[in-house]
Amino acid sequence: MKDDVYDRITNRIVESLEAGVRPWLKPWNADHAAGKITRPLRHNGQPYSGINVFMLWMEAEAAGYAAPIWMTFRQARELGGHVRKGEKGTLVVYANSITKTEQDSETGEDSTRTIPFMKGYTVFNVEQIDELPAHYYAKAAEPVLDPGERLEPVEAFLAATGADVSHGGNQAFYMPSQDRIQMPPFEFFRDPESYYATLLHETVHWTKHPKRMDREFGRKRWGDEGYAMEELVAEIGAAFLSADLGITPDIREDHASYIASWLKVLKNDKRAIFSAASHAQRAATFLHELQPAEPDTPAPDVIADQAPAPMGLRLS
C-alpha cells in the first residue's frame, strides 16, 4: 500500500479526533437497537478485524448505514445484486509481504528478508446494493439485556481470563508491578455497561504483561508517546471487545486530554494507528482464546483480514 493511503486513513481519524469524536466509540445510529453495536461483517458473516473495524464504523456513521454487512462489487454481483450507479465504495486493507533475496557484496552469499506491506480493496455496504437476498437487509436485533442487571455473558468472559481484579476506591487502573486490576465498586458506575467497558479497557492493559503479550512502547509517563500509544491500544481493544460482547463502549471523563495525546502520536507517525489497531486486535484475540471452547463456535474475529476470495472460497 502506498504511503498516501496511510495518510488518507490517518488523516480521517485525526479529523474525527480534532472534532472531539472517537471514531471507535460512535459506530451506531438510530436504526440500531438502543445503540447496541456489532463488528462489521463480510458477505459470509465473518467479522472484519483490526483497523478495518472502525474504518467501516466511521463510514457507516457518516453515511447513516444501519446494516453491518459489506462486500465487494464482484461478491454482490455473484449473489444476484448490483451496486447502484454513483455509489462510492469504502477502502479496507489487509497485510501482505514479499520476500527478497539479496547478495552480500563482500561475501557473495545470498540472504533473504521478508518485507511486510499493506494492500487495499473496495467494499460496499449492502444498503448501497439492490436485489441481494432479503436476509442481507435485516435490521439489528432488539436488545435483550436488562441495563439494571449484571451482564452474565460479560461476567463469564472476564472471569475466564483469570485476571486478578480488586474493587475499592474511585479509580480504575492496571498495576503491572502487582499484575492486578483495580476497579471502583460496581455500584459506583452509572450503569452496568459503563462498568464493563471500563473493566475491558483495563483488561486490555492486563494483556501487556511480560508473561502474556509482553507489549512495550517505551516511556510510560503521562504525556509520553509510549504512554499515549498504550492507552490508544487499550481504548481500541476495549471497543472491539465491547462490540463482540454486545455492549456500548464508555466515554471516559478524561476524554479531551487523551484525545490531545493521541493526536500528537498520530500526527508524528502516519502508521501509528495501524500499529495500535493491530496490537488491539491481538489483545482482543488473546482474551478470546482464554475462553472455554465451544463446539463449532469459533471465537469472534480471530481471523486476519485478507484479500477478497472468489465466491465459493472461504474468506478469512
Each PLM stretch: what is its role?
Residues M1-S316:
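N-terminal accessory/interface modules of nucleic-acid-binding and processing proteins
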